[in-house]
């Protein structure tokens, strides 16, 4: 009856890690490491069929948080947790350089690739780097609208049918936010101007444009439908 517990927990892990990294809040680090210990003790006994069944549900980028916690502490239990959330059905096709995105939920994919980017930075796993690069270019070249946003009703669609998806439900802000995060990783590795160009385009046309500066309003979608807001 619970929608996505690890998706919610990811926000707690990520926020506490940021508290420690950006404000040197030692209490935040203590809390998040205890949460990591709890997660390890809870998940370590699970068998493989149970693991695969569990990660079919959306879990956000909790594996990225575990990689970050591993980077901070050096505790290999947190690396194990990050690898535990490796989603074979999603990541394996990208390793094979296949665009298997279909009509799947867009923002379920991007955080999982973010975790692979972090894995490469910590372990020099070249498979993780290659699939990150492939995914980024596939997204930008085939699944992104002109302003830098992606998705219709939160899902991928056939890029050959783009004209049928100029709706009032395009451009989920979460997707662009995570694509900017992924772009930062890629640009640090390559210095590729194409990555920086996308970052600038998506930041100004979508992320900043989604906010109303005077009254504090914001929008969830960036509609591509003419005259729709």
Predicted regions, residues:
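Glycan-recognition and catalytic cores of secretory/periplasmic carbohydrate-active enzymes
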Residues: 1-229
């Amino acid at each position: 009856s619970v929608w996505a517990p690890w998706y919610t927990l990811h926000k707690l892990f990520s926020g506490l890690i940021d508290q420690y990294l950006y404000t040197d809040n030692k209490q935040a680090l203590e809390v998040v490491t205890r949460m990591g210990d709890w997660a390890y003790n809870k998940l370590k006994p699970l068998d493989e069929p149970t693991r695969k069944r569990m990660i079919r549900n959306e879990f956000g980028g909790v594996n990225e948080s575990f990689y970050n916690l591993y980077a901070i502490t050096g505790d290999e239990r947190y690396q194990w947790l990050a690898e535990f959330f490796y989603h074979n059905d999603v990541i394996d096709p990208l390793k094979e350089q296949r665009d298997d995105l279909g009509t799947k939920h867009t923002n379920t994919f991007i955080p999982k690739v973010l975790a692979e980017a972090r894995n490469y930075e910590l372990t020099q796993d070249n498979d993780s780097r290659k699939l990150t690069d492939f995914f980024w270019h596939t997204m930008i070249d085939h699944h992104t609208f002109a302003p830098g946003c992606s998705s219709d009703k939160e899902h991928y669609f056939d890029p050959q049918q783009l004209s049928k998806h100029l709706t009032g439900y395009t451009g989920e802000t979460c997707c662009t936010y995570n694509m900017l995060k992924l772009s930062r990783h890629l640009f640090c590795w390559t210095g590729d101007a194409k990555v920086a160009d996308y970052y600038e385009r998506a930041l100004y046309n979508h992320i900043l444009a989604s906010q109303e500066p005077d009254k504090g309003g914001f929008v969830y979608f960036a509609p591509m439908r003419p005259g729709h807001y």
